[in-house]
């Protein structure tokens, strides 16, 4: 089977939406029966985003096989059925690390190690490896054409197109076509200069996706085609939309998938986008709305919680309600009190690291528990719920996590010191171990208790969810907490670790150690988020009586 590659680049400015455009195109090609995957190549020097600040980089998306990756991989999984893996995302730092390790081992037989050919060859090998077994691979190059960091990647894809044959490689370039209000027209010059920049590297784009706040007129698209040496039907207008799930239909209506299939000589049926039309219909026709407060520490950049925000929206789709998300800084709860949590239909505490704002989260969990407000805790959100219950219900004064207070009297959450890696080998880690790549990561099996609320929602006794954490519930102190009324609703496959807790005498209080947001999609939703939004609607109705 021959694999075809679509290389996606961006020009003029960053944040044009290359990831969304690539994912939308992949969704159309998948709807034509093709086996599609997407890769993201990040030009930064970090080995992976695992230790990067969420405020700088956005969330870290965790794949099934435990890779800490760029948030764009979350978009990919929400748009196509193919599951991403560690092969779908790599960085400049990862490439250089691999090449330097080979150099130290002597693999290059004393040769002078250079960007060309050693770095570019390593990039090409990764791309080929990631594309194995697929009909079409979309490869998104992070950054903007012209950035010095992107040059090795651009050179590598230029070479790769020659290596595999131009009949199996296609370059798609996203560019900005700004509207000038004073002139009353869109301007094509930035696009022309961006393509000129690509040409100077040796890449002639085959398709241009023109991003604008409005539809780019046909005469302007013809002008772009003429000056950029691109077929007129390959100049696609992609205007701003109120829902990203409309983009597959917009691209299909302009014949982008037909153009690509013809270019690659792929004989496949017409795309059926009925599932996406259903998503758009559900989004456009809600029967009500709810307000959910998300209490976190990285709220100045909503992308830090991208998958959680999307999963809440998916929960809204499944309940035919619009979810209004109110982002609340947990430090504000500490300084201003729980008054700022008034008028919420439900409360969610997402994952996080570090002590800043933790007491605000503990106070939030208590407020939700004592006032019967639906509560969903994720990762740290489960740990603070446990700490709060231990302190205020189980009589364990000053209970805490050893992450925050190492020598506390009741360490109800503690560091896991023994781990099994993907090969089954036992590793011992301590608080002095490296932060990068040393967490419990990826898909893990969980057994649900028969009487639990989550068992009803999932409809199955065992589930698989993705993890990203270093601290766990301390089993040594669990008996006292359970005796006070907390329900252990889910345990790890080996029965050793607590994965889900519930408060039984509460309408809906669920907290999980894993990250359910990573497996939620607009077409299928997720049982926990669908149940959570439903509980918010029911709470709203009770309050209105």
From Swiss-Prot:
CDD domains the UniProt entry points to: CTPS_N, GATase1_CTP_Synthase
Binding-site residues for CTP, renumbered to this chain: 14, 147-149, 187-192, 223
Entry EC number(s): 6.3.4.2
Residues given in the record as Mg(2+) binding sites: 72, 140
Reactions catalysed, as given in the entry: UTP + L-glutamine + ATP + H2O = CTP + L-glutamate + ADP + phosphate + 2 H(+); L-glutamine + H2O = L-glutamate + NH4(+); UTP + NH4(+) + ATP = CTP + ADP + phosphate + 2 H(+)
GO CC terms: cytosol
Region Amidoligase domain: start-end pairs: 1-266
Domain Glutamine amidotransferase type-1: 291-542
Pfam families linked: CTP_synth_N, GATase
Recorded superkingdom: Bacteria
Binding site for ATP: 15-20, 72, 239-241
PANTHER family named in the record: CTP SYNTHASE, CTP SYNTHASE-RELATED
Subunit structure: Homotetramer.
Record's miscellaneous remark: CTPSs have evolved a hybrid strategy for distinguishing between UTP and CTP. The overlapping regions of the product feedback inhibitory and substrate sites recognize a common feature in both compounds, the triphosphate moiety. To differentiate isosteric substrate and product pyrimidine rings, an additional pocket far from the expected kinase/ligase catalytic site, specifically recognizes the cytosine and ribose portions of the product inhibitor.
UniProt name for this protein: CTP synthase
Native species: Citrobacter koseri (strain ATCC BAA-895 / CDC 4225-83 / SGSC4696)
